[in-house]
Amino acid sequence: MVAEAGASIQAEDVNNDPFRVDQLILDYDYMLYRIKDHVASIHLATTELCRKQNQLVCTGIVEEIIDSNIKNVRELLTKCKELETYFEQLHAIDGIVSTFHERMDEIVKQYRDIKVHTDSASRDHVATK
């Protein structure tokens, strides 16, 4: 009984939102959240590295600390690359959204052309009988 209710709700959701726009909105919001999280993380790590670097300059530089800082900078670069990937995804979404109306207009035009052709063929078929 519960499985049937869940399937009914799921089918109703698909009927109410056949293009799954609600899911796209959730995915988009989550991606923005992840970008903000990455930016905050990079900001904190960069601030900490700068503080440590300033401390090293003031107190003297030790080779181990330099190696540790290089490792931290590499980790930051990895996070920056992940952030770049998210921005590329946003750019791809922008491309899809910007051409959405054009593609929908083309689909409607094709549908009307098919309907006119089908109606014309039906009239010709009826007329020949």
UniProtKB/Swiss-Prot annotation:
Superkingdom, taxonomy of origin: Eukaryota
PANTHER family given for it? BIOGENESIS OF LYSOSOME-RELATED ORGANELLES COMPLEX 1 SUBUNIT CNL1 (PTHR39145:SF1)
Q: Which organism is it from?
A: Eremothecium gossypii (strain ATCC 10895 / CBS 109.51 / FGSC 9923 / NRRL Y-1056) (Yeast)
Instruction: Note the CDD domains from the entry.
Output: BLOC1_CNL1 (cd24144)
Q: What is this protein's function? A: Component of the biogenesis of lysosome-related organelles complex-1 (BLOC-1), a complex that is involved in endosomal cargo sorting.
Name assigned to this protein: Biogenesis of lysosome-related organelles complex 1 subunit CNL1
Q: Which family does it belong to?
A: Belongs to the BLOC1S4 family.
The question of whether Transport is a record keyword is answered with yes
* GO BP terms, alphabetized: endosome organization; regulation of protein localization
UniProt entry tagged with the keyword Cytoplasm: yes
Quick one: where is this thing mainly located?
A: cytoplasm
For this record, an example GO cellular component is:
BLOC-1 complex
Q: What keywords is this UniProt entry annotated with? A: Cytoplasm, Transport
Q: How does it assemble?
A: Component of the biogenesis of lysosome-related organelles complex-1 (BLOC-1).
**Cell location:** Cytoplasm
